A protein has these predicted regions:
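Active-site flanking loop/helix segments enriched in acidic
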Residues: 29, 41-70, 120-138, 414
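Structural motif
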Residues: 31-36, 58-61, 74-77, 141-147, ...
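Short, well-structured alpha-helical segments
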Residues: 35-46, 61, 82, 110-117, ...
Length: 475
């Protein structure tokens, strides 16, 4: 009797295992138990892609299943998104229409699948105008349903995870496109884990030798990092327990791409980067106690033990980043004379940091009146997209500026925080306060020192604007 397994039977087993894994993750999520709906979408997609293989040799249906798994497990989305992910290639690759999807699964799923079909393929065309138009289509979908863009990012993530089956030239092009547009887009939507993986996978295919070098360096220094973490945590644990907290404290290592990027920007070696290692403290919220106050209690407990570096405090609990990120960051001198970055966040903050937009809306349901920085950014993007006939290059530059902009956080004399783009000047700050203040300003004090209005601001600066009633705006 032959021991060779029937290839078709092996494929069937592979497919069933992937679907069972998806259902298991879904049943352990917080969403309604719409298993029948998901099973129906899976059965439909499986039939539509029957007999089709990917370049890797596996059945094509494994790709929609993997995208659905990312959407469910890594983004925390529900059955509508899972079904849409399962069906996202049916209209493009099989003999079905959006109308067929609508008849089978309803308007909402059909609209999402239609949006995904319109933006299928790559963003980079041969010319800037084609590139701009493709990216415009991609971002326009945010107006109708943010889930289109989230599923598209999940689709790109799985394609990057399986990029090894493609020819090197194709790998290089897709990796470049991912690093140029998809990783910043994931970052702007708060998908930190996915953004990091997209960057690292792109780095792996664009700069394989540098990627391997950094991974070897990380591996060779792993034992020393583990010892540093144990020495650091030993005196901190009793302090946190004394606060009555349920928490976890773990070590976090900077991603390969982030390390390489910092080496390039600062012109330093691997050994010269001191923040490769960080400690993350995640606590469960206490009843009737504001999470912000708990963050500062933990801060006090740590600074009772270790010497702080004041210029490295980053307070994103008082005001979140534009992508919804909240945490309190500080840097202290560790037990072995090394600087250690610490990130303090609640479980809610951690979920928003890792799952981004999906978690943002989950927690926002009970606070509809809040108008967050993320909402403002989406509104800005919408306004840009509504420009009827943008110049292709101007459009791409504008969008990239909005995707890549790093915020700085500055203070008024009363201690109010204002968010400005990186490289903002004292004059930009004046206009951010009010148009009239911008028009009447004659100078500024930054950290109590007189500076010209062209002075570039940095995070943590305190700015006082000097005005004159007689000052008139310059034409």
């Amino acid at each position: 009797m032959s021991n060779v397994k029937d290839p078709k039977a092996a494929d069937e087993q592979l497919i069933q295992q992937a679907f069972d894994s998806l259902l298991n993750d879904y049943l352990h999520s917080n969403h309604r138990r719409k298993v029948e709906r998901i099973t129906k979408a899976f059965t439909f997609a499986r039939h539509a892609h029957d007999g089709v293989k990917r370049l890797s040799g596996e059945p094509y249906i494994m790709h929609p299943l993997a995208v659905a798994q990312i959407v469910c497990s890594e983004m925390g989305l529900g059955s509508t998104s899972i079904c849409s992910a399962l069906l996202h290639d049916v209209v493009e690759d099989a003999d079905y229409t959006v109308e067929d999807i609508k008849n089978m699964f309803g308007d909402k799923i059909a609209q999402i699948v239609d949006g995904l079909t319109k933006i299928s393929g790559g963003i980079f065309g041969e010319q800037a105008s084609a590139q701009a138009e493709n990216f415009r289509k991609l971002l326009l979908t945010m107006n109708n349903d943010i889930r289109v863009i989230l599923i598209k990012i999940a689709d790109r993530l799985h394609n990057m995870r399986t990029l090894g089956a493609m020819l090197p030239a194709k790998q290089y092009k897709i990796a470049g496109e991912t690093l140029y547009l998809y990783a910043p887009l994931a970052h702007r939507l708060g998908l930190f884990s996915i953004k990091t993986e997209l960057e690292d996978l792109s780095f792996k295919y664009e700069h394989p030798e540098e990627y391997d070098f950094i991974h070897q360096q990380l591996k060779s220094t792993e034992k020393a990092r583990n010892m540093l973490f144990e020495h650091f945590a030993a005196p901190v644990d009793p302090k946190l327990k004394a606060l009555g907290l349920t928490y976890e404290m773990r070590a976090r290592v900077k991603s390969a791409y982030s390390i390489w990027n910092k080496m390039q920007v600062k012109g330093v070696s691997f050994e010269d980067i001191y923040d490769i290692f960080a400690v993350r403290i995640i606590f469960e919220s206490l009843p009737d106690v504001d999470d912000k106050n708990v963050c500062w209690d933990i801060y006090s407990a740590i600074t009772d033990i270790y010497r702080i570096r004041p210029d490295r405090i980053r307070d994103w609990v008082s005001r979140s980043k534009a992508n919804g990120y909240q945490a309190l960051h500080l840097t202290v001198m560790g037990p072995d004379g090394q600087w250690v970055e610490i990130q303090i966040r609640s479980r809610r903050m951690d979920e928003i940091a890792e799952k981004g937009f999906a978690a943002h809306w989950k927690y926002k349901e009970n606070h509809v009146e809040e108008d967050t920085e993320l909402d403002k950014w989406l509104q800005t993007i919408t306004e840009i997209l509504e420009n009827p006939d943008p110049n292709a290059l101007d459009f791409l530059d504008t969008i990239k500026m909005n995707l890549f902009t790093t915020e700085i956080f500055v203070f008024t004399p009363k201690g109010d925080i204002k968010t400005l783009p990186q490289n903002a000047t004292a004059l930009d700050f004046a206009f951010a306060l009010h148009t009239n203040i911008g028009n009447k300003c004659i100078g500024a004090k930054v950290n109590h020192r007189l500076v010209p209005l062209s002075h570039r601001l940095s995070s943590g600066d305190q700015i006082e604007i000097l005005t004159s009633r007689s000052q008139q705006p310059q034409a």
